[in-house]
From Swiss-Prot:
Disruption phenotype: Flies exhibit reduced proline oxidase activity which produces sluggish behavior.
Protein name (database record): Proline dehydrogenase 1, mitochondrial
A molecular function (GO) term: FAD binding
Pathway: Amino-acid degradation; L-proline degradation into L-glutamate; L-glutamate from L-proline: step 1/2
Gene (name only): slgA
Length: 681
């Protein structure tokens, strides 16, 4: 009873009920802010151009209404416990008991106060049976052993050989597989999705089957698929990071938290497309639109599917396209000065005509200028990307620019053979098919970030998919890795494009998955390290980027604009970052019901963050892997490796698990059956 009183007292003392900030700006300030927001000048939206370096070093000082400082917020800044009397403790215990015995009636969804210290084991694990808690504790105990984790794949294969298939599958379902994976197929995962939803949490589905291939095979496939049949020509001005290097051909090197696809052939890419579409159907609630879907209403149109572009096409094409994008930026910088994306220079077609004036009446230059993407505020892109994503442009003919000295058209991409042009159109066709299916099924797509040598192409294509499909709501989301030095600038640029082309912008913010690999590759190939120097710098990048998104959302709300034109997922296992986001929302008057901010964590990790958020009415997601036991072993191996690297988080999760197991034993709840009455936002 002493332990129970202690837990109840702690929970009562530090609970924080979300209160929307009711303070309003004066009309004159709001009008001024609206004018500033709708201005398209260089200073109106904090787009990082020539002053990016100073902006990066000083944080978001221009938006101090968002937060009191640039350092991560501690729980103490959000929760100020008061002295709790014994009567309050008894009342809290009585309320807890009453909730368990008499949940809210149907039609009256339950909402709990949020403990932003994330120290409440009851809120964290009320969706779990006691057996599941014991399993989780044992899994984390194993993840705490470096030797076991280091050789986990070898041990799993050994167990498979010794036990045979049936016993091995039973063992895995009782341990790692049961903890980290929802089920074997889209039918067997339905109970897990329904239970998640009943406790306020929504799914991001991912079919997590991975090939278990050797390093030698991975390197062979990557080298073959990353070089054109015309050869790997490194012309003048080429950039080494966008060419394959055998030393880093196995893209799994030092990567534990992301899946890797290796290109085999076009048929494999077609199968991957079909798998992604099946994921969409699995999260769709509308059986009339998806007759093969499991019509349970388990996600009610709020589900998400994650995809990777490297699963849909030949990586060589993404490498070449990424190099084109970066060489285009360099071309523009050399011509007009400054740094950054083309649209950040705020140049017009007339400005370009002046630059090319010395070339005279040049037919090729005129044709080039006719194809430049621009609006009344200036140039957005030098190339017609809309034609590229609509599958009606030839890459070799598209990416040419006038030489300012000679007037001759200069290729920014080497001549692509017709067969590879067709492969690129196939990749774009597959992506269009997936996104169109998502739009028809009312399911969102999150395009995962990948290595920096692929990312310029991935982001460019994803933004064009947003422009094409995010006309009425955010269907397509891009992923931004905050361990990269350029993330703040890139997000600002993409937000500006979304505003100017009037489409809904969706972003998933993550810390990143490829840090060690990126650093080693940059050092080996001799290009600048793209990664932030410290953990703290990455945290600052995450918080500044999130703050800028929230600043723009606030301005849209103040101007009676549709604030849902910007949607952000805070995909983080970092408590300080989650607290920071909650505090920002509260301070500037963004409520969970506004549906512009959501939170996400992996299944089997940080339940003490996800479930309290969902039960308090925030939009909370779990990344839900599924697939046959023996085919998800590489995924399980990576989860074990990732948990080894976050021992501090494991320590807290183990402590909370043990606390809840003891509480249930003391209260005779060994056979507790989870039953929730929460409705996700």
């Amino acid at each position: 009873m002493a332990l129970l009183r202690s837990l109840s007292a702690q929970r009562t003392a530090i609970s924080l009920v979300y209160g929307r900030n009711s303070s309003k700006s004066s009309n004159s300030v709001a009008v001024a802010a609206c004018r500033s927001f709708h201005q398209r000048g260089s200073g109106s939206t904090s787009i990082a151009g020539e002053g990016a370096a100073s902006e990066s070093t000083r944080g978001v000082n221009g938006a101090r209404f968002l937060h009191s400082g640039d350092r991560p917020l501690q729980a103490s800044t959000l929760v100020q416990p008061e002295v709790v009397s014994s009567e309050t403790v008894k009342r809290s215990m009585k309320q807890e008991s009453s909730q368990e015995k008499n949940p809210s009636p149907a039609g009256s969804p339950q909402r709990d106060p949020l403990d932003v210290s994330f120290n409440d084991p009851i809120a964290a694990f009320k969706s779990k049976t006691t057996g599941e808690l014991i399993r989780a504790y044992l899994v984390y105990m194993i993840c705490s052993s470096e030797k076991l984790v280091e050789h986990n794949m070898t041990l799993m294969k050994l167990a498979r050989n010794l036990l045979g298939q049936k016993l091995f599958v039973l063992l895995m379902k009782s341990s790692f597989y049961g903890h980290f994976v929802a089920g074997e197929n889209r039918h067997t995962i339905v109970p897990a999705l329904e239970r998640l939803r009943s406790f306020g949490v929504k799914p991001i589905l991912d079919y997590s089957v991975e090939e278990d291939i050797t390093q030698e095979e991975a390197e062979k496939r990557e080298v073959e698929s990353s070089v054109s049949s015309a050869g790997d020509k490194k012309e003048e001005g080429s950039m080494p990071q966008y060419h394959v290097d055998k030393s880093f051909a196995d893209r799994r090197y030092k990567v534990s938290s992301a899946r890797t696809y290796f290109y085999l052939n076009e048929a494999t890419c077609e199968r991957n497309m079909e798998i992604f579409i099946k994921c969409l159907e699995a999260v769709s609630d509308d059986d009339r639109k998806a007759p093969r879907a499991v019509a349970t209403g388990a996600t009610f149109g709020t589900g998400i599917t994650a995809i990777k572009l490297t699963a849909l096409g030949r990586p060589q094409l993404l490498l070449q396209l990424s190099e084109v994008i970066m060489r285009t930026r360099k071309y523009m910088e050399d011509m007009v000065g400054g740094q950054g994306n083309v649209l950040t220079h705020h140049k017009t077609i007339k400005d370009l005509e002046k630059y090319y004036a010395t070339l005279g009446d040049n037919k090729d230059v005129k044709e080039f200028l006719n194809n430049v993407t621009s609006d009344k505020e200036g140039i957005l892109h030098l190339f017609p990307w809309s034609g590229i994503v609509d599958e009606d442009s030839q890459l070799s003919d598209t990416f040419r620019v006038p030489d300012p000295q000679t007037g001759q058209m200069r290729r920014l991409i080497s001549q692509i053979p017709p067969k590879e042009e067709e492969m690129f159109r196939n990749m774009i066709r597959r992506l269009n098919t997936i996104v169109k299916a998502a739009a028809d099924l009312d399911v969102r797509i999150m395009v995962d970030a990948e290595q920096t040598y692929f990312q310029p192409a991935i982001s460019r294509i994803t933004l064009e998919m947003m422009r094409k499909y995010n006309k009425d709501k955010a269907i397509v989301f891009n992923t931004y890795q905050c361990y990269l030095r350029e993330t703040f600038r890139e997000v600002n640029t993409d937000l500006e494009q979304a505003k100017r082309q009037n489409f809904y912008f969706g972003a998933k913010l993550v810390r990143g998955a490829y840090m060690d690999q990126e650093r080693d590759r940059a050092k080996s190939l001799g290009y600048p390290d793209p990664v932030n120097p410290t953990f703290e710098a990455t945290t600052d990048m995450y918080h500044r980027t999130l703050s800028e998104c929230l600043r723009r959302i606030k301005l849209m709300k103040d101007c009676d604009d549709d604030a849902r034109k910007i949607g952000i997922m805070v995909a983080s296992h970092n408590e300080d970052t989650v607290r920071f986001a909650i505090q920002q929302m509260k301070e500037i008057g963004i409520s969970p019901e506004d549906k512009v901010i959501c939170f996400g964590q992996l299944l089997g990790m940080c339940d003490y963050i996800t479930f309290p958020l969902g039960q308090a009415g925030y939009s909370a997601y779990k990344y839900i892997p599924y697939g046959p036991v023996e085919e998800v072993l590489p995924y399980l191996s990576r989860r074990a490796q990732e948990n080894k690297g976050v021992l501090k988080k494991i320590k807290k999760e183990k402590r909370l698990l043990l606390s809840e197991i003891r509480r249930r034993l003391m209260r005779g709840q060994l056979f507790y059956k989870p039953k929730g009455n929460y409705v996700p936002i």
